Amino acid sequence: MKRTHLHVLLVAAVVLFALNMRAGVTSIGPVLQEIQDSLHMSDAMAGFLTSLPTLIFALVGLITPMLSRRCGLHVTMLVAMVALSLGLIVRAFMGGTAGFIVFSIVALAGIAITNVLMPAFVKTHFPQRIPTFTAVYSTALTAMAFLSSIVVAPMSHSMSTGWRGAIGFWGLLALLAVIPAAIPV
């Protein structure tokens, strides 16, 4: 692969990874009532669901360095993006609370791994431009967190699949991040 193509691919990877680091979390709140009604989810379980990101980020974050050392940075990022996209897509179409929670955990594990490894990915591939690429991924992460939270309710009301299509959409975006993650560098 030509050096310029590799550079473009790595920049795309940083942006696509970052765009997927919060949408799966922030898109739930605006449609939580619809999710609860559809899945017959109790208020206690909804509270548990909304506390899962903090718990999963902490637990998976602890083991991520070990996973990265054992499997390598790129393989671990690929696994994270696959878990994230699979979790987001499948959870949207689960018929019950248990499946929804399980696949939320799968997606959150992917996000947690990405949270921990993004600084290492930037340092590995852009050692002379760490502040610039940290700003790029921080901006993309924050922008998508905002965007997903404000568009998910209108999407839910305009899609024939309702809240399921609206939250599953973010899994399709995560699939795009699998592409640069899967190309060996």
Annotate the PLM regions.
Residues 48-57, 141:
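Transmembrane alpha-helical segments of major facilitator superfamily
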Residues 59-98:
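Conserved MFS/SLC helix-loop-helix module at the cytosolic interface between two early adjacent transmembrane helices
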Residues 9-43, 61-64:
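Extracytoplasmic
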Residues 42-50, 134:
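Juxtamembrane helix-start elements in MFS-like secondary transporters
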Residues 87-91, 107, 181:
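MFS-fold secondary transporters
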Residues 103-139:
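Cytoplasmic helix-loop-helix junction between adjacent transmembrane helices
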Residues 26, 54-62, 145-146:
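Residue-level signature of mid-helix packing/kink "hotspots" within the transmembrane helices
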Residues 99, 128-129, 136-184:
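Helix-loop-helix hairpin linking two adjacent transmembrane segments in secondary transporters
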